[in-house]
Amino acid sequence: MINRVLIRTRVLQVAYAHLHRGELSLSAAEQDLELSLQRTYDLYLYLLQLIPSLTDFYREVLEVRRRKHLATQAERTPNMRLVENRLAAQLSETPELTAWYAGFGLRWEDDEALLRHLLRKIEHSELYQDYAHARSDSWAADQ
């Protein structure tokens, strides 16, 4: 989320840029600051949307693995913990985030290579292994 430290940083960046450009217009600096904060907020929402996009992509990957001709037992009955993550489900059901993402120009789904790379990193991480094999199934564990 946008916090005070980020706002202070943006204010100093905009003030520095306007000082070195020789512009002394307060209204122009204010408009630049508003634009900068809006872009930061858009980036924050875009990164939030990565979570449901990643779980949806993982669901598709698991389905492809399941339909493989010579699928192993692990591929036929995969661990669905990440696909059924409560945080991802709640984010995908948030109407404000869904509406914003529908109007935003970029899509995580368009960059399949990045999603595949992130999934590979996640699947091989020790943190994911602990999460996937944990006995407790709670909201706190999903976060």
Regions found by a protein language model. Name each.
Residues 1-143:
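Class I Rossmann-like S-adenosyl-L-methionine
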